[in-house]
Amino acid sequence: MEAVPRMPMIWLDLKEAGDFHFQPAVKKFVLKNYGENPEAYNEELKKLELLRQNAVRVPRDFEGCSVLRKYLGQLHYLQSRVPMGSGQEAAVPVTWTEIFSGKSVAHEDIKYEQACILYNLGALHSMLGAMDKRVSEEGMKVSCTHFQCAAGAFAYLREHFPQAYSVDMSRQILTLNVNLMLGQAQECLLEKSMLDNRKSFLVARISAQVVDYYKEACRALENPDTASLLGRIQKDWKKLVQMKIYYFAAVAHLHMGKQAEEQQKFGERVAYFQSALDKLNEAIKLAKGQPDTVQDALRFTMDVIGGKYNSAKKDNDFIYHEAVPALDTLQPVKGAPLVKPLPVNPTDPAVTGPDIFAKLVPMAAHEASSLYSEEKAKLLREMMAKIEDKNEVLDQFMDSMQLDPETVDNLDAYSHIPPQLMEKCAALSVRPDTVRNLVQSMQVLSGVFTDVEASLKDIRDLLEEDELLEQKFQEAVGQAGAISITSKAELAEVRREWAKYMEVHEKASFTNSELHRAMNLHVGNLRLLSGPLDQVRAALPTPALSPEDKAVLQNLKRILAKVQEMRDQRVSLEQQLRELIQKDDITASLVTTDHSEMKKLFEEQLKKYDQLKVYLEQNLAAQDRVLCALTEANVQYAAVRRVLSDLDQKWNSTLQTLVASYEAYEDLMKKSQEGRDFYADLESKVAALLERTQSTCQAREAARQQLLDRELKKKPPPRPTAPKPLLPRREESEAVEAGDPPEELRSLPPDMVAGPRLPDTFLGSATPLHFPPSPFPSSTGPGPHYLSGPLPPGTYSGPTQLIQPRAPGPHAMPVAPGPALYPAPAYTPELGLVPRSSPQHGVVSSPYVGVGPAPPVAGLPSAPPPQFSGPELAMAVRPATTTVDSIQAPIPSHTAPRPNPTPAPPPPCFPVPPPQPLPTPYTYPAGAKQPIPAQHHFSSGIPAGFPAPRIGPQPQPHPQPHPSQAFGPQPPQQPLPLQHPHLFPPQAPGLLPPQSPYPYAPQPGVLGQPPPPLHTQLYPGPAQDPLPAHSGALPFPSPGPPQPPHPPLAYGPAPSTRPMGPQAAPLTIRGPSSAGQSTPSPHLVPSPAPSPGPGPVPPRPPAAEPPPCLRRGAAAADLLSSSPESQHGGTQSPGGGQPLLQPTKVDAAEGRRPQALRLIERDPYEHPERLRQLQQELEAFRGQLGDVGALDTVWRELQDAQEHDARGRSIAIARCYSLKNRHQDVMPYDSNRVVLRSGKDDYINASCVEGLSPYCPPLVATQAPLPGTAADFWLMVHEQKVSVIVMLVSEAEMEKQKVARYFPTERGQPMVHGALSLALSSVRSTETHVERVLSLQFRDQSLKRSLVHLHFPTWPELGLPDSPSNLLRFIQEVHAHYLHQRPLHTPIIVHCSSGVGRTGAFALLYAAVQEVEAGNGIPELPQLVRRMRQQRKHMLQEKLHLRFCYEAVVRHVEQVLQRHGVPPPCKPLASASISQKNHLPQDSQDLVLGGDVPISSIQATIAKLSIRPPGGLESPVASLPGPAEPPGLPPASLPESTPIPSSSPPPLSSPLPEAPQPKEEPPVPEAPSSGPPSSSLELLASLTPEAFSLDSSLRGKQRMSKHNFLQAHNGQGLRATRPSDDPLSLLDPLWTLNKT
């Protein structure tokens, strides 16, 4: 039925308009009632007249409907201002023609005009609805709408204009028109439903409703009054309507029959089809004389219904045989009205347009507007009262809490150095000699001070001596021999001058001491400020909050943010309410509203504020809940608040102290200069006085001698008597003996400097002064001295007692007093030789060892050891200094000493109470720097009779820094390892001498001095199983704060030509880590002895003055010349001295290197809570990714931030080299660009990108090299010591020559760029990238460096990679290669074509992946992007890249979760299997052949590489440093097969007890490696004690063990045939001596 031809529709004619002269009446009313000039409204009246002309001659289209509606609205506006209704003041006659009769009808009422316009509006809509053919869906909809609008217009006219102005607008005619229009609209809807094949039952109901509407219209047409009014058209309409009633009834029953057929009610189906056929036949009868369209529709329908009826009847007759019910018994079809009259709103502004008479506002409208304003004000006052009450409560609550959201969580402020301190550090960094200048100035001042004091003492001594001589003279001669008055007066004048100068000196001495105290107070801080920034940062206090405390803090922050959010929302809502009320003006509505409906209008208008009121009330109600939560959070925050408050005080105090030290520097320098000037003047005066005193005293002595001679001639010769020996004052001898203090001690006040004292005669049990003090305080003996100076290296004719430098002991600590039974000491004096020294040969002294007290054995009574006093033995010194060509340092030489005298045996011990449990070190803390003599070669005269002590690590009492000391606390002392183990093997079962954490660091002024001899007790050991002792580089505490470590120097003992005992292998002791404290290296060989118990961590050392050093390159250029014989046990030159390694100077740039990459020690996701947290973060992160608007906002914020940041950074240098920039808008900032040190100019378009993550290496982001900048690129690779280059350029770009090939592509075809030549070593292609190993050689140097070039070719220039998985896999490959290099702070070079787009995305993803792998969760990507862009503009150039990075992070986190057994939330992507291969590319610094590396780096690297791989571990993580061995490992837990590195075999001539044989362990299978076949790293890794072998397959050779070394073998030594497979077999061990 959807194709049935359309039935014709009924439409109405338009009424014709007559005259309406409204202008004169309106003008008259405006003049009279409004008091305005009516001519001012001529324009408005003309507009209204023009609008009426258009309305009465309306076009027959949709535009005509708009004109009619607009005119209707303007008439409504005019009526509300000028009363023109029936009987009103401004009424004028209105004339229109009546349709049916054609007569003109006039009324003096503007409402008649409005009614006629409404009628024409309905008629025009009926015309437009009937004109459409309704063959399309759109046509059916338009016709349906027009008929509904027509029905609306007629219905509005019928209801709002009750007076029948004319016959065609009578109520009966309007009702007829409404029903006709609704029926035709429903008919259009029926046609649309049949076209859409709606359900049969629904179509039947729609059709039945059409029948209902037409029946209503038919009843109106049959009304006699209506029939008489309509005239001729009544018959035509009635026939058409009746025919349609039967027709649509037939259609309704047809679809009811279809419904029965669907329900398989075949009898009902026949009944409905029968009824439809009957009604259709009735319609055909009534259709006679109708147009062809009606006939066509009836015929079509007859075909459909007839066919359906015949088919149904046959089916029922022959198949179903159901009874056919009567139609009356079937359910009647109820109509479904789906159309309605569309209402007319005459004052709709969208239809009427602007009010033409808007300027005319009646007074009544103003009054109503004021009433409405009062209603609005009442509403506002009510809401503001509630808001103010709540705000007052909130303010009082927050004031009482004293919680400022800005300062509650200022933990970030403690993580970096504050700006004011950074300014001070920067000011000191450009003045590196600040501390040195201050110390030197104070040293000069101290020197002059000491000279003045010495001169004054000399004057005093001369005067006292003169007085003594005068007394003797008087005794001998009497008053008769008085000296001249002039001489006495002159002497008195000298005394007065001396007293005056002494008084001035004493006053200045106090000032000088204060100045030194101030200097000592500030110099440490100044050293700290001028040192590395990480040390400054470490000196500032840091918050120590537990995770629970941080959670409390975060909770409080969250609630405070809620409070602020609530406040902001409240202010915003209040502002919205005020603005809405202020803008709300309904005057125009009031003008057109009747006075009786004002109240109703107010209520409707005030409803618009209901939504805002609801929001405000919800906000106010939430305040109580938020404050309750804030109270609970504040209670939990109390403890954290106290911690943060204390931290803030400490932070501010430390900050003020450091700033005050900086500000005091200039004042100290000024005062120091004033002191120097003062003392220089005083010195000259005192020197003059000293000369005068000497001359005066000499003159007096001469005079006395003359008188004495004269008197002696008179007297008989006396009996010979011996005069009383003079006892010189101790201070005098000290002043003579002390000499100049060392350089570091000259800056100390004079009252703190004392020379070594001569011993008094032994009295009872007093401790002789020439013995070192006891390690623990005693009630007897002298108190500890803070400092003592060593003997100056001059020639002394000393006393017979042995003078030994005092070493300061620890600060005095109380010891429980008790009775002690001490025997009297015994000693054997012996006349000593006078040692001599020369500038090249220091005094080779051998102070008696063992003079200190032996440590008490736990549980045994202790007594002081036997004191031994004797002369210091001096060695005969060779007059020559031997030098070797390859060693640029003098080699001191000397001969062996005489045997030491045999000390007395220990006296018997008596029980004494044990001291307090405060163990002290057996070695003496070195308070001042001692002159370091050369190595000793003792002869075989060994004293006997001393038991060997049990030496173990002794805890050091924690020292407290003294205000007047210029040095920090001493590091804990360790027992000294044996220097000559063949003389005195110590008795130490189960213990080996531990190694100190501090290496010996050379001090200024003692360059090139070897370390002091390692003295141990000269005790022969009892017959136990001794472990072979070891000797090595001994760490010595320096006299100041511990110095930052220079590269540790390996000192081995110089063996004599004929060894007397076991030779000690050199032992390299690693220095502390760069963080300033001793950190154990990961995976080291277990220590030979347990480490001492943990003590307090020493304060961070200030940076020391660097001694004059060799350049780094000079040391590295001749690495193997550093005495390989001394390190590998080869023979030495006859000079016998050990060559000294000069410390290498690190460049300033190298000093600023970032800290090494932080390694991921273990899997952070072993804990389930970490996994759960990661899952939650992933869900939140997915939400961000799914929100396109949020990503757009983030991108806009990043762009704005970049513009803001770029304004504060300069690119002036880059602009000068425009030819070296690929794009003129991509240039590096001046502050962090890479500077070329050895090129023609220092510019390259490359930026250092650091600080993205502690687990991500530093990166150098650069553009792809241009043809003219490839040499600069490789020069940067060489200078930065880069080992890994990442290239993110597609093959298409290289084929189109957008990017030049700057690397060799064929083996055997090297490429030269400037001074560098490149060669391709190997190429390997994988499914994600191309890996090239290149070798880089600089000019004519023979050394080559290897580096890895990783090319990711599947990232197009203007797109994205194929999948995030490939890029993630590539990043893991890059990181794996990076971890194989050493050291771990060299950067990775990353470039695409421009160096910002793909490079930025790679860097961002690299950092994010490392953060996730380290267990830190998903980082804030926008923060990382901004951090990158602060270092290089335009990093991450496209928003597409940002979205890709978000997706890649999601993919990586899913992989991490899958790795730990957490299934993905949706269908996972293709799992990118991470190929974990042990790639071992050649290291950038060839550690075996040397390269540009100091020997310390080689040693440190070998130590780092000494890792035993666990069995069966195949992932690359096995090669990473892991957690260190626990420090307290007992010796029993050492692997028995691990050889102790420091042990040495006993000599062949010295039989020793056999060591137990080590148990053989099964060999550990090596993890398979797919890296290159050999590299320097592999070789170095094989040099560790665990893994050393000359061939990886062992080739069937016997494994060497300790037992092999203990057995004697007859061989040719160095002339033995070397195995051909030894990679070092071709090295000549004597090559340094054969070079010439």
UniProtKB/Swiss-Prot annotation:
<dbReference type="GO" id="GO:0010633">
    <property type="term" value="P:negative regulation of epithelial cell migration"/>
</dbReference>
<dbReference type="InterPro" id="IPR003595">
    <property type="entry name" value="Tyr_Pase_cat"/>
</dbReference>
<keyword id="KW-0653">Protein transport</keyword>
<comment type="similarity">
    <text>Belongs to the protein-tyrosine phosphatase family. Non-receptor class subfamily.</text>
</comment>
<feature type="repeat" description="6">
    <location>
        <begin position="963"/>
        <end position="964"/>
    </location>
</feature>
<dbReference type="GO" id="GO:0005654">
    <property type="term" value="C:nucleoplasm"/>
</dbReference>
<keyword id="KW-0963">Cytoplasm</keyword>
<feature type="repeat" description="5">
    <location>
        <begin position="961"/>
        <end position="962"/>
    </location>
</feature>
<keyword id="KW-0969">Cilium</keyword>
<dbReference type="GO" id="GO:0043231">
    <property type="term" value="C:intracellular membrane-bounded organelle"/>
</dbReference>
<feature type="repeat" description="4">
    <location>
        <begin position="959"/>
        <end position="960"/>
    </location>
</feature>
<dbReference type="GO" id="GO:0036064">
    <property type="term" value="C:ciliary basal body"/>
</dbReference>
<keyword id="KW-0802">TPR repeat</keyword>
<feature type="repeat" description="3">
    <location>
        <begin position="957"/>
        <end position="958"/>
    </location>
</feature>
<feature type="domain" description="Tyrosine-protein phosphatase">
    <location>
        <begin position="1192"/>
        <end position="1452"/>
    </location>
</feature>
<dbReference type="InterPro" id="IPR025304">
    <property type="entry name" value="ALIX_V_dom"/>
</dbReference>
<keyword id="KW-0225">Disease variant</keyword>
<dbReference type="GO" id="GO:0005634">
    <property type="term" value="C:nucleus"/>
</dbReference>
<feature type="compositionally biased region" description="Pro residues">
    <location>
        <begin position="1542"/>
        <end position="1556"/>
    </location>
</feature>
<dbReference type="GO" id="GO:0060271">
    <property type="term" value="P:cilium assembly"/>
</dbReference>
<feature type="region of interest" description="Disordered">
    <location>
        <begin position="701"/>
        <end position="812"/>
    </location>
</feature>
<dbReference type="InterPro" id="IPR016130">
    <property type="entry name" value="Tyr_Pase_AS"/>
</dbReference>
<feature type="compositionally biased region" description="Pro residues">
    <location>
        <begin position="898"/>
        <end position="922"/>
    </location>
</feature>
<feature type="compositionally biased region" description="Pro residues">
    <location>
        <begin position="1523"/>
        <end position="1533"/>
    </location>
</feature>
<keyword id="KW-0378">Hydrolase</keyword>
<feature type="compositionally biased region" description="Basic and acidic residues">
    <location>
        <begin position="701"/>
        <end position="714"/>
    </location>
</feature>
<comment type="function">
    <text>Plays a role in sorting of endocytic ubiquitinated cargos into multivesicular bodies (MVBs) via its interaction with the ESCRT-I complex (endosomal sorting complex required for transport I), and possibly also other ESCRT complexes. May act as a negative regulator of Ras-mediated mitogenic activity. Plays a role in ciliogenesis.</text>
</comment>
<keyword id="KW-0677">Repeat</keyword>
<dbReference type="GO" id="GO:0005768">
    <property type="term" value="C:endosome"/>
</dbReference>
<feature type="domain" description="BRO1">
    <location>
        <begin position="8"/>
        <end position="394"/>
    </location>
</feature>
<keyword id="KW-0887">Epilepsy</keyword>
<dbReference type="Pfam" id="PF03097">
    <property type="entry name" value="BRO1"/>
</dbReference>
<dbReference type="GO" id="GO:2000643">
    <property type="term" value="P:positive regulation of early endosome to late endosome transport"/>
</dbReference>
<feature type="compositionally biased region" description="Pro residues">
    <location>
        <begin position="983"/>
        <end position="1002"/>
    </location>
</feature>
<feature type="compositionally biased region" description="Pro residues">
    <location>
        <begin position="1036"/>
        <end position="1050"/>
    </location>
</feature>
<protein>
    <recommendedName>
        <fullName>Tyrosine-protein phosphatase non-receptor type 23</fullName>
        <ecNumber>3.1.3.48</ecNumber>
    </recommendedName>
</protein>
<feature type="region of interest" description="His">
    <location>
        <begin position="770"/>
        <end position="1130"/>
    </location>
</feature>
<keyword id="KW-0968">Cytoplasmic vesicle</keyword>
<dbReference type="GO" id="GO:0061357">
    <property type="term" value="P:positive regulation of Wnt protein secretion"/>
</dbReference>
<feature type="repeat" description="TPR 2">
    <location>
        <begin position="374"/>
        <end position="407"/>
    </location>
</feature>
<dbReference type="GO" id="GO:0005829">
    <property type="term" value="C:cytosol"/>
</dbReference>
<dbReference type="GO" id="GO:0034451">
    <property type="term" value="C:centriolar satellite"/>
</dbReference>
